[in-house]
C-alpha cells in the first residue's frame, strides 16, 4: 500500500461513519498497544485507585452514552449531537438521531458521559448512560 499523506488520511476519515471510526480506533489501539482515552479520564481514575482494591475493581470507569429518542425537538438534538460527537457532519448527525436508539459515545469517562447526557436532555432527547 502506498504511503498516505495526513490530508489523504483525513479525507478518508471524513467519509467514514461514526461506527466505522470507532472500529478503526479500537483496532489502532490493539495494534499499537496504546489508548485514545483523554488524559482527564486517567486523572479522574487516579484517586479511585488509591482507595480499597475491591471497590476499584467493581467501580465502572468507562461509560456508553446511548440516544434512546430525539423527542419533539429533533433539530436541537441534532445540533447537540454534532457538538458532542466531534467531526460529525449534519447528515451523519441527522442519520444518527433518526436511527435512535444508537450509541453516541463509547467508553468515555463518567464526567464526559454525564455532561453529554445533560446537554442532550436539555435539548429534549431521551438518553441512557451504561
UniProtKB/Swiss-Prot annotation:
Disulfide bonds: none annotated. GO terms for biological process: translation. Keywords: Ribonucleoprotein, Ribosomal protein. InterPro entries: Ribosomal_bL12, Ribosomal_bL12_C, Ribosomal_bL12_C/ClpS-like, Ribosomal_bL12_oligo, Ribosomal_bL12_oligo_N_sf. GO terms for cellular component: cytosolic large ribosomal subunit. It comes from the Bacteria. The keyword NADP does not apply. One of its GO terms (molecular function) is structural constituent of ribosome. Signal peptide: none annotated. Homodimer. Part of the ribosomal stalk of the 50S ribosomal subunit. Forms a multimeric L10(L12)X complex, where L10 forms an elongated spine to which 2 to 4 L12 dimers bind in a sequential fashion. Binds GTP-bound translation factors. Forms part of the ribosomal stalk which helps the ribosome interact with GTP-bound translation factors. Is thus essential for accurate translation. Belongs to the bacterial ribosomal protein bL12 family. This is Large ribosomal subunit protein bL12.
